Swiss-Prot record:
Residues annotated as binding L-citrulline: 87, 123, 127, 175, 260, 272
Matches recorded under InterPro entries: Arginosuc_syn_C, Arginosuc_syn_N, Arginosuc_synth, Arginosuc_synth_CS, Arginosuc_synth_type_1_subfam, AS_cat/multimer_dom_body, Rossmann-like_a/b/a_fold
Species name: Bacillus subtilis (strain 168)
Location relative to the cell: Cytoplasm
Gene Ontology biological-process annotations: argininosuccinate metabolic process; L-arginine biosynthetic process; urea cycle
Name of the protein in its database record: Argininosuccinate synthase
Pathway: Amino-acid biosynthesis; L-arginine biosynthesis; L-arginine from L-ornithine and carbamoyl phosphate: step 2/3
Pfam families per record: Arginosuc_syn_C, Arginosuc_synth
Length: 403
């Protein structure tokens, strides 16, 4: 008798992946569950036990918050990744890390396959499967939800017939994904792009009507592009991001309502909450404005846009992403300093920045008697700078005379 095949399942503890355990067993697999906490606050012990009770032969739970912060969210921060100028890549950032852990466990357990709970309509199926195949091309990838194509009612009926616990929040109209970089929400009334998102769709941010009437001013310190403290108190990166989620979220910072172009070819209306991410990106950009030379500052946004597209499109483990990341790391060597930010009524407003590597020279910028700028040097500069345009104009006038 041949040995039963093994599959590692990306397990969330919800209905879809709980049903997937039983379904995969019925397809002849031993199911090994794997759940990561990337900052959404999962009860890992509960999820681990639930997977075993549903039928998994083994259940891994991994606290990956700091790894996610250091190796994934930090790249998003330093690259100011804003897909289509609005979305700081919440879900897109966690998928490659989850895929990496799934592959590691599959190799450890000698599993032949990896399974995920994505539908055939979203971006995540692409991100998971491209990442998995990039890391180990020999692993089979199974997508139970995409394969069975059941209605919600059929799925519940299947679960009930096999004794699978049905979550108490099943009646929620929303589909939510969350990590320390933010919260993504879709479905329900949000599918109508004209409908205003109800307050029930939000969790990390306060409505403007209920935010404090007094601004909160904070100071964020960076070392080589990495945020290290708030108001002089040091934190690990994951702790700092979560702390800023609380602080900025209380002031309503970071709400994003976005009709985006999905990788699979459709438009989708998403509501995001990214209070910590949006505050950090704004502060980091202001510190770069102080410390990067003009040529790098003007070229970097081109890299940022491409990096945003690559990550959104599931190409985290691509050679191009690695090459762009190498450029990015080079730009961060002198992005060290402190940024003062005012949090107030949905805004994170930068009010000051300072750095030992500042390229701002007040004596060159001032219009007072302390002005050290050589105004006479401007005469020759203007002549040479405008020379090509001047020559072009002279030639055109000669052509007009001939005509």
């Amino acid at each position: 008798m041949s040995e039963q095949k093994k599959v590692v399942l990306a397990y969330s503890g919800g209905l879809d992946t709980s049903v997937a355990i039983k379904w995969l067993q019925e397809q002849g697999y031993n199911v090994i569950a794997c759940c990561l906490d990337v900052g959404e606050g999962k009860d890992l012990a509960f999820v681990q036990q639930k997977a075993l009770e549903v039928g998994a032969t083994n259940s891994y739970v991994i606290d990956a918050k700091e790894e996610f912060a250091q190796d994934y969210a930090l790249i998003s921060l330093q690259a100011h990744t804003m897909y289509e100028g609005k979305y700081p890549l919440v879900s897109a950032l966690s998928r490659p890390l989850i895929a990496k852990k799934l592959v590691e466990i599959a190799e450890k357990e000698d599993a032949q396959a990896i399974a995920h709970g994505c539908t055939g309509k979203g971006n995540d199926q692409v991100r998971f499967e491209v990442s998995i195949k990039s890391l180990n091309p020999d692993l089979e990838v199974i997508a139970p939800v995409r394969e069975w194509q059941w209605s919600r009612e059929e799925e519940i009926e299947y679960a009930a017939s096999r004794g699978i616990p049905i979550p108490i929040n099943l009646d929620s109209p929303y589909s939510i994904d969350q990590n320390l970089w933010g919260r993504a929400n879709e479905c329900g009334i949000l599918e109508d792009p004209w409908a205003a998102p109800p307050e029930g769709a939000y969790d990390l941010t306060a409505p403007l009507e209920k935010t404090p009437d007094t601004p909160e001013v904070i100071e964020i310190a960076f070392e080589q592009g990495v945020p290290v403290s708030i108001d002089g108190v040091s934190y690990s990166l994951s702790e700092l991001i979560l702390k800023l989620n609380e602080m900025a979220g209380a002031h309503g910072v970071g709400r994003i309502d976005h009709v985006e172009n999905r990788l699979v070819g459709i438009k989708s209306r998403e509501v995001y909450e990214c209070p910590g991410a949006m505050t950090l990106i704004k502060a980091h950009k202001e510190l770069e404005d102080l410390t990067l030379v003009k040529e790098v500052a003007h070229f970097k946004p081109i890299i940022e846009q491409k990096m945003s597209e690559i990550i959104y499109n599931g190409l985290w483990f691509s050679p191009l992403k690695d090459a762009l990341h190498a450029f990015l790391k080079e730009t961060q060597k002198h992005v060290t300093g402190i940024v003062r930010v005012k949090l107030f009524k949905g805004h994170a407003i930068v009010e000051g920045r300072k750095s030992e590597y500042s390229l701002y020279d007040e004596k060159l910028a001032t219009y007072t008697k302390d002005d050290a700028f050589d105004h006479h040097a401007a005469i020759g500069f203007i002549e040479l700078w405008g020379l090509p345009t001047k020559v072009n104009s002279i030639v055109k006038k000669k052509e007009q005379i001939k005509a």
